[in-house]
Amino acid sequence: IEPSKYPILASNSNPMERMWAEGTWLRAYLAHGCYWHRCGFCDTSLDYVCSYKRVYVEKLHKGLYEQGKKLGVAGVHLVDEAAPPVALKDFALLNLKESKPLSFWGNIRFEKSFNRDLADFLAHGGLTGVSGGIEIACGIGLDSICKGIDIDTIVSACAAFKEAGILTHAYMIYGYWLETEQILVDSMETLRQLFQEGLLDSAFWHKFVLTKHSTVFKEYLSGKHPELNPLALDGSIIPQNKPFNLQENFAG
């Protein structure tokens, strides 16, 4: 593929969203799977989520750098479920040793590991943007989805990235089965404040959809969450503690 032959059909004033729409990227991941893999809404029973294993960063960087020179592409999109902070640091360190370093961005978790020192180092090493799931931006909401981080940690990580000049995007969820109107309002207010304080460049709201590979659905089939009442394709409620053909009756 010759990227220069494909024109940009539309432009976007949001710099974070322009990465998706207008950039040309080499794609790779620093780790297979997610090192957390416990979020209630996520497909945690699938191999690409639950089987976590880091790649050899040295080989990955060398391969991407050589491929980039051949194609004339200097940007890398790290398509991890959540790029490990240590692997990002290793990648940035290798990148700094090159005369013409790559630029890279990818998906992360807003962990406490991402302090200002690490964010500055990653930015110096070529990191230009991060995207990460906040999902439900209040304490009760984060606990309900087993996110494993709290609001203070999210705010600190976002601040570190933005102060280092790294573009920052958040994924949000609405309609989670345990979410009340007040939890949704609180989540929206937190997001508003994050934008107001300049800690986010963009965000996107996703409607919660229950999938057959999620932790919540697995728990439902074992007898938990009787109030969940998920629907099969024919509109009937999927039974608990009974034989059920997921392949035929449940999408997702």
Regions picked out by a protein language model, each given a short descriptive name:
Residues 7-10, 26-29, 38-43, 75-78, ...:
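Structured core elements
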Residues 132, 170, 191, 203:
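Hydrophobic, well-ordered secondary-structure elements that form the walls
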